[in-house]
Amino acid sequence: MKENEETTSAGDEANQTTDPLHAGQAESSRPAALRAADAATAPPSQTPTVRRGWPKEGWLLLFAVAALAFNLRSPIVTIGPLVGMIRDDLGVSGSFMGFVTALPVLAFALFSPWAARLGRRYGMENVLVASLVALLAGIALRSALPSPLTLVLGTALLSAAIAMGNVLLPALAKRSLPEHVNLVVAMMTAGMLVSSTLAAGIAVPLARWQGWTWPLGIWMLTTGVALVPWLRIRHLHRAAAPTGSAPTASTPLNVWRIPAAWALSLYMGLQSLVFYAVVGFTPSVLQEKGLSAEQAGNLGALFQAISLLGVVAVSWAPVRDRGRQWLSVGISLTVLAGSLGLWLGSTGTQWLWVSLAGIGTAGVFSLCLMLFAERTDSPAEAAALSGMAQAVGYGIAAIGPLGVGVLYDLLGSWTRTMGLLAALSLLECLLAWSSASPKTLAQTLAGHRHGR
């Protein structure tokens, strides 16, 4: 009984965490375990102040999140349209370029769990600043010194840096702007989508004008811009910390042992698999259905552009608790409808199914980022859950396209492989309800222990 009361208290006070950018209730009123978990993600410990509503530095943080998110996909997406040019110029094989394009997803799966640990030990602001510096170095390495070796090393370095931002931004939103997590996630997801679309659009024209190293290197400019507000935020955080304080390495819940965390991780993993498979193979499916390469390319652009509607729909939907579960099911059914349409739909209706797939996959991704904050009791737990879910998710995403390719070899048809995506989308729908449960991980764990 006592354990249940402590768990409920932790859940009730999840959104009252304080830091120099957002203050809430007095620390003394919060459970000791939760105070320790919060301290785990903070850099030097901070002096609480009571400040409700939108904090004075909130706009700075929001801009910093958007600027960082803008660089979380563009350095990766740029490679795809330039594969042929890079292969011919460096004299490498198609298999080598396939490895380079798969490297970011593999790096996300490998480095995501480490992001939460580094955030607890050194402070999230410090890790994010360091990751931006590493991102700059990775971009510079492969664009200024073009060779097969630097292409691999630079891509690996920038991918590891991006993994830090992927994991820590949702946790930072929970700590610094707990009442506006939806807004922060919307800015983060929109920044990724806009930069991905821009990167894909300018890569080839810029490469034809100045060579393929230019579209790879141009993102040093946007990364440098993103570094400026994060240096300021780190300074504010340090200035508010008491003298002599130091980060603590205490550990939150072990999310890897919680069934609810695994359900959410698999939910995100299926979303990632479907997304990367649609992006990678839909052009071939559409051409097999009779569309020209240009028409297939236009529908690919539609997929990216209309994804913003999914972000807006999920971020601004006025739902909470059980309503969030219905939203999760609804947006997952949108993915299922898109997958079924790509498989069974006629040529003239493909624009509709591509649109539904784009809206659905982006919506589920945004929802997962929100759930990292909403289903945890502290920023430390949010970072741990985010790291686990993204490690599992991108691990599945890395395997998925390979499986689709093998299935194509067996069936001899790209269209038939969409049946596999439809089946996986159905499984995603089955996980949607439990993944969006209003209970925190600690509450579900307590329920399991008491047989509920």
Label every PLM stretch briefly.
Residues 91, 123, 144-149, 178, ...:
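Helix-breaking motifs and short loop linkers at transmembrane-helix boundaries and internal kinks
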Residues 110-149:
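Conserved MFS/SLC helix-loop-helix module at the cytosolic interface between two early adjacent transmembrane helices
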Residues 79-80, 259-311:
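Extracytoplasmic gate region of multi-pass secondary transporters
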Residues 376-421:
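A late C-terminal transmembrane helix in Major Facilitator Superfamily
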Residues 111-123, 310-323:
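Helix-to-loop junctions at the C-terminal end of transmembrane segments
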Residues 164-177, 363-377:
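Intracellular juxtamembrane helix-capping segments at the cytosolic ends
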Residues 150, 178-180, 186-235:
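Helix-loop-helix hairpin linking two adjacent transmembrane segments in secondary transporters
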Residues 154-192:
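Cytoplasmic helix-loop-helix junction between adjacent transmembrane helices
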